[in-house]
């Protein structure tokens, strides 16, 4: 099957900037580019931990929900990748990824938590239990269910960040949303679906409103800058320039997602990182 794309976004992470400033760690953050170095990230975690915040961040691994966040933090820290460039194999067992997983495991304030997935992490970040979230995007930044958009439940500032890197060139995971048609053998219904999709996703007078309704960004440059004048969306658009490889097309993707959180659980339970990632790749 094929997808007719409509909109996309870049997944990122977020920090409680109020708490980061409180412990003097905002010096490690480039607030204009929303970037930081791996060393700066680790120093920020350390400052928060020593400042009295025992639970700074979580490597959540109860399931696949939000797994793009744990992949991105691990791949970005030391220049690792999730697959090879040709999308023929998975590379979790690279030296760069092993170093990142081991570093996260050994860092005080970061916990491998098999009881939560991405959605749970967001809740814990919003309620102040965690001071960082690895499962984040513009939909979360704009969420106003429990307070104004961009604030935690207690009113602290939420600041979106690219994942930390040694190189200064973050590679973010992207999400692409669109439409598909199932071939049920009824040509009339298939044609009607085509007409509907063409209207929603390609009609010059409609597509802008369709993308706006998604709260994401257009996949086609022809749609133009639909968020001109919107300070939050314009600022967040900086993350689109950090989009990395769309490796979800690699064969065995469904199995890889399951094996990923299983691997993180094993590391959290004390298994050697080298052993855990070898099992991931072998499976």
List where the protein language model places each region.
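Periplasmic solute-binding protein
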Residues: 1-30, 42, 61-86, 168-182, ...
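Bilobed periplasmic-binding protein-like "clamshell/Venus-flytrap" ligand-binding domains
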Residues: 2-3, 50-64, 202-213
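Short, solvent-exposed loop/beta-turn-alpha elements that line the ligand-binding surface or hinge
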Residues: 30-34, 57-59, 80-99, 147-152, ...
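Glycine-centered hinge/linker elements that transmit conformational signals in sensory
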Residues: 42-49, 85-118, 163
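Extracytoplasmic/periplasmic substrate-recognition and gating elements
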Residues: 102, 107-109, 148-215, 262
């Amino acid at each position: 099957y094929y997808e007719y794309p409509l909109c996309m976004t870049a997944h990122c992470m977020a920090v409680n900037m109020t708490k980061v400033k409180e412990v003097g760690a905002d010096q490690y953050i480039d607030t204009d580019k929303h970037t930081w170095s791996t060393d700066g990230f680790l120093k920020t975690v350390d400052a928060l931990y020593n400042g009295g915040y025992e639970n700074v961040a979580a490597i959540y691994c109860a399931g696949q929900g939000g797994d793009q966040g744990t992949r991105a933090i691990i791949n970005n820290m030391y220049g690792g990748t999730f697959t090879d460039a040709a999308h023929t194999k998975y590379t979790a067992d690279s030296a760069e990824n092993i170093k990142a997983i081991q570093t996260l495991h050994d860092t005080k304030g970061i916990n491998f938590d098999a009881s939560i997935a991405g959605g749970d992490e967001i809740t814990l970040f919003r309620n102040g239990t965690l001071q960082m979230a690895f499962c984040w995007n513009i939909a979360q930044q704009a969420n106003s269910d429990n307070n104004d958009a961009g604030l935690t439940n207690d009113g602290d500032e939420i600041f979106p960040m690219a994942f930390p890197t040694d190189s200064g060139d973050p590679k973010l995971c992207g999400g692409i949303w669109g439409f598909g048609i199932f071939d049920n053998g009824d040509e009339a219904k298939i044609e009607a679906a085509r007409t509907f999709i063409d209207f929603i996703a390609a009609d010059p007078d409609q597509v802008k409103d369709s993308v706006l309704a998604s709260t994401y960004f257009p996949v086609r440059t022809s749609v133009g800058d639909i968020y001109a004048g919107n300070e939050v969306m314009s600022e967040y658009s900086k993350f689109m320039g950090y989009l990395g490889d769309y490796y979800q097309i690699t064969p065995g993707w469904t199995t890889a997602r399951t094996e990923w959180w299983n691997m993180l659980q094993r590391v959290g339970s004390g298994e050697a990182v080298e052993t855990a990632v070898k099992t991931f790749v072998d499976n």
